């Protein structure tokens, strides 16, 4: 049975009340985790973006160097905003700039021992919170992403 013109928007099926509830629940679950994260990061004396940048440096994909361009992309922020975060982290003793061994023109970012300690503590707390929040997040995602072949909610 095809969808009438009233059942689609731009060729996509209109959302049902159940779809909106699933989206709202997913956003709620994400927001709960982010609220936890903001409090934990603030208690450690950092800003949310600073923690994210440190995590991005430590968690760069294999073969990708921690350059400003890559970090800005990973964080989805502008280059100048990334530089500002790096400057504040460097002033606080959390990160340092290094020259690449194979290309001395290239500047890479690295965590200092202080940055490593703070990141490890925060990441452990975040990992534990995610373990606790995972059932709610997974359930919300399942509501949003019905298995193939399953009838859509109505």
Residues of each region from the PLM?
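N-terminal leader segment of winged-helix/HTH proteins
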Residues: 1-44, 92, 148-154
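Charged, amphipathic alpha-helical coiled-coil/dimerization segments
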Residues: 9-10, 87-145
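Short, structured helix-loop boundary elements
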Residues: 20-23, 47, 68, 127, ...
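Pre-recognition alpha-helix immediately N-terminal to the DNA-recognition helix
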Residues: 25, 32, 52-56, 117
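N-terminal helix-turn-helix DNA-binding core of bacterial DNA-binding proteins
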Residues: 35-78
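Short, hydrophobic-biased segments on the C-terminal half of alpha helices
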Residues: 68, 86-87
């Amino acid at each position: 049975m095809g969808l009438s013109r009233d059942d689609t928007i731009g060729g996509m099926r209109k959302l049902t009340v159940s779809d909106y509830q699933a989206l709202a629940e997913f956003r709620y679950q994400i927001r709960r985790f982010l609220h936890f994260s903001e409090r934990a990061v603030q208690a450690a004396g950092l800003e949310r973006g600073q923690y994210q940048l440190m995590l991005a440096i430590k968690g760069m994909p294999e073969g990708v160097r921690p350059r400003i361009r890559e970090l800005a992309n990973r964080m989805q922020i502008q280059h100048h905003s990334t530089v500002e975060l790096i400057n504040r982290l460097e002033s606080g003793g959390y990160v340092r700039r290094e020259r690449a061994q194979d290309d001395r023109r290239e500047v890479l970012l690295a965590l200092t021992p202080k940055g490593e300690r703070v990141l490890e503590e925060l990441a452990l707390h975040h990992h534990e919170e995610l373990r606790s929040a995972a059932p709610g997040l997974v359930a919300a995602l399942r509501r949003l992403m019905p298995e193939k072949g399953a009838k859509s909610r109505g």
